[in-house]
Each structure stands twice: as structure tokens, then as C-alpha cells.
Design a protein with these regions (language model features):
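Transmembrane beta-strand segments of outer-membrane beta-barrel domains in Gram-negative
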Residues: 1-125, 182
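C-terminal transmembrane beta-barrel domains of outer membrane proteins
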Residues: 86-238
Length: 238
């Protein structure tokens, strides 16, 4: 299977309040997507077009040791099919979904930090796979491969403890991830692991995570039990 998505987006963000200690913004984004999914070397597939508008409220508040950021939003869109061999027909047409993201950082001392995050989505209508909420992968439950579990509504959370390793630019991490897909065919995933982050201003950014499942080890995507999953991300900053 393979696929290609072209996304065109135009948006505006307006500050309502912005100080060092707190901020509040609202934004509106108009988005167009051309989506192509193929299997069997293109013999079967779908070609879809999506037009949507998204409105968000977001901001942060912080003091000496605490930092909290948040986003709430809603997406209204329309999905049309140009070619269809296997896409769910009830996902075609108008769709709506609501989103929320929360992120909290507590500075324990100069070297230790506690990071807590939670995100969620509620689909008010059936959603195409391109608009669904996924709870596995490098930015979700890291013990499972990308796309292991998804649906129109779900929750995802992470608790991560970080230790800065001197002035090397390295940070060691220990984490627990958990997520739930709700609705038809409820699915739960959880995992725990260790990681290493390298970050310096205008230099390379690197992130390595190793994770193992908590509870069920069976991967529907791979068709077998898994013991661990590793992720590596490298970014050159200029």
C-alpha cells in the first residue's frame, strides 16, 4: 500500500492577550487536501478531496516552575470521492469534529522536569481515515506501530519524567503512554519506555525512544505479539 497527500492551507491567528505569564489567541484556518491511497500497485485505491475550515482557541500560562498550554478547536469540512474501491461510503460528505490538547510542565529543580500531556478528539459524524484520531506511533503510544488503532473519537495521554544531563544537550526520559479509541470497537493501548533527546540551538535535534507494551502485546497491524518498538527522529536546525 502507498499513498500521497497534498495539503494547501491559509490561516490567520489573532492575539487577544499576550504577556510573559499568559496568552490567549484565536485562529481560523482554511484547508484543502488531495488524498490518494493505493494498494496492489495502484490497481485498487481511492482518490479523495477534502475542504475544511478550522477554528481554534489556544494559549498558555506560566510562572517560576509551572507551564501550561492548551488548545480547543472545531473542524467542519466536506469530503468528496473521485475514485473509490474500498473507502467507507458513510464518511463522504459533510463532517464535523472537535479537538483538544493540553500540555503541562513542572520544573522539579534545575535538572528534573515532569511533563504531562493529553489530547482528544470527538467525531460528531463518521470520519474518513484521513480525519480520524490515532493513538499509536512516534507521537502517541510509542510501544505500537503507526496506525495500530484509530477511530473518530479518542483520548491520548503521556506522563514523562526528564533528566537534563549536564551541558551536553542530552536529556534522558522515562515515560508511560496510554490511549483509547471510543465508539464502535473500543480499543485501548498502553506502553512504557525510555528515551534520549539531543537538542541545542541551531544544531541537530535528535530523539530516540524505546517502548514496550503494558497489558496486551498483540499488534493487529503486524499480526503478532510485539515485545518492543524503537523510534529515531533526526532534524537539522538552521
Amino acid at each position: 500500500a502507498d499513498g500521497l497527500t497534498n495539503t494547501y492551507e491559509l490561516g490567520i491567528a489573532i492575539p487577544v492577550r499576550r504577556t510573559y505569564a499568559q496568552s490567549l489567541f484565536y485562529s481560523v484556518n482554511v484547508r484543502h487536501r488531495d488524498i490518494h491511497d493505493y494498494i496492489l500497485s495502484g490497481t485498487y485505491g481511492t482518490e479523495k478531496a477534502s475542504d475544511s475550515i478550522e477554528g481554534d482557541l489556544y494559549g498558555y500560562c506560566r510562572d517560576g516552575r509551572n507551564s501550561f498550554s492548551w488548545t480547543v478547536g472545531h473542524v467542519a469540512g466536506d469530503l468528496s470521492l473521485r475514485r473509490n474501491n474500498y473507502s467507507a461510503p458513510d464518511a463522504v460528505g459533510n463532517y464535523h469534529k472537535s479537538l483538544a490538547d493540553l500540555y503541562y510542565i513542572y520544573d522539579i529543580d534545575r535538572d528534573w522536569q515532569l511533563h504531562l500531556s493529553m489530547s482528544g478528539q470527538y467525531g460528531w459524524t463518521p470520519l474518513d481515515s484521513s480525519e480520524q484520531f490515532y493513538i499509536s506511533g512516534a507521537d502517541a503510544v510509542r510501544a505500537f506501530v503507526q496506525g495500530e488503532a484509530g477511530g473518530r473519537s479518542g483520548l491520548l495521554g503521556t506522563v514523562e519524567l526528564r533528566r537534563i544531563l549536564g551541558r551536553s544537550g542530552l536529556t534522558a526520559t522515562a515515560f508511560v503512554d496510554a490511549g483509547r479509541i471510543m465508539g464502535d470497537g473500543t480499543k485501548d493501548l498502553a506502553g512504557t519506555g525510555l528515551g534520549l533527546i539531543y537538542q541545542k540551538s541551531r544544531d541537530w535535534y535528535g530523539k530516540f525512544d524505546w517502548a514496550t507494551p503494558l497489558g496486551c502485546h498483540y499488534s493487529e497491524s503486524l499480526g503478532k505479539d510485539i515485545t518492543s518498538t524503537a523510534w529515531l527522529r533526526l532534524v537539522k536546525q538552521f
